[in-house]
């Protein structure tokens, strides 16, 4: 019984500590998901709609647009 009470108190304390020390920039929930909101307005902006390149297709090392994620001028494997 004492252990259960201690666990409940610990969880309540950690929850209160999390809310007390959370960084609130003054906007609250306004800018919580700005990118997701932009993607809802413009579905083409979503990364899920972008096509990845298959093996042996030319790729850009900096954009990492290969399906496998390995690019050495051409997508590997």
UniProtKB/Swiss-Prot annotation:
InterPro entries named in the record: Conotoxin, Conotoxin_omega-typ_CS
Tissues expressing this chain: Expressed by the venom duct.
Cellular compartment(s): Secreted
Propeptide feature ranges: 23-49
Signal peptide from the UniProt entry: 1-22
Cystine pairs: 52-67, 59-71, 66-75
UniProtKB keywords: Calcium channel impairing toxin, Cleavage on pair of basic residues, Disulfide bond, Ion channel impairing toxin, Knottin, Neurotoxin, Presynaptic neurotoxin, Secreted, Signal, Toxin, Voltage-gated calcium channel impairing toxin
SUPFAM superfamilies linked: omega toxin-like
Main location: secreted
Record-stated family: Belongs to the conotoxin O1 superfamily.
Function, as annotated: Omega-conotoxins act at presynaptic membranes, they bind and block voltage-gated calcium channels (Cav). Specifically acts on L-type channels. It blocks molluscan dihydropyridine-sensitive calcium channels.
UniProt comment concerning the protein's domains: The presence of a 'disulfide through disulfide knot' structurally defines this protein as a knottin.
Protein name: Omega-conotoxin TxVII
């Amino acid at each position: 019984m004492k252990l259960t009470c201690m666990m409940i108190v610990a969880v309540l304390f950690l929850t209160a500590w999390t809310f007390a020390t959370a960084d609130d920039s003054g906007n609250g929930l306004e800018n919580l998901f700005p990118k997701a909101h932009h993607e809802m307005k413009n579905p083409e902006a979503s990364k899920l709609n972008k096509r990845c390149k298959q093996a042996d297709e030319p790729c850009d090392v900096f954009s990492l647009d290969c399906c496998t994620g390995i690019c050495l001028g051409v997508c590997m494997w």
